[in-house]
């Protein structure tokens, strides 16, 4: 029986879990990934450090696995959505990764709400931009760090950065592509969407869209040396963690509501038609012709972490 490696990077912890093909956990490991808050409303982390922690978790999971790494048939990653992970044209991190807890672009999102941009975005993309949406963050970067904005080569999501580290290839998947820049009807990029946000200069930087289960690349010798994986192991495109959560819980189906209590509180349901509204995001489902409607609030497990760090530090360290 072959093995599968799943990687899950949330807003606090990165995890590597090895499963058999019956879905049983064979081994697992995790690493806490530090966040930095360099100024008010900025929540970010070092992209190279994120990969290092993830590689260590993979290595630990392999060490705890009673079977060799050569038994792993495929790898896939999932991670938090929204936020921003930028590379330059040479594939180097251009700035710290911005988490979906970041709110530096709040004024931009509010302005778009007032001037009609948000309404147009809802009509075309299925969602109104919010403070940590890639569209708002890129507009913030254009206004506040124009030199860095001009050097953007690739606009990625978190799990796409981790896959790049594993394979050296640039791509995203159907679910993650719909965080800001896809047509809600066609579920693909459209020429008129980037200009809604004044971001038409970045048409070259959007990654190719793959099916979540498509092979997006293979483990490079460099990644194999860091992790203990076998070079050449296939790596699938993966998917947004919100959608992955409902799928893993058995809640990815029409007429079923899935509830996620992680760093964010999320309520989601799948439909065979694009249903849009101001109170939720309508994003791509796992397959063409499927949509995932999700209502999201950043008021869940992260609040518990803050409470424990602030009031129970001694007990937590014990």
Label for each model-derived stretch:
Residues 63-100, 128-134, 163-183, 208-213:
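Short beta-strand-loop/turn "lid" adjacent to the catalytic site in phosphate-handling enzymes
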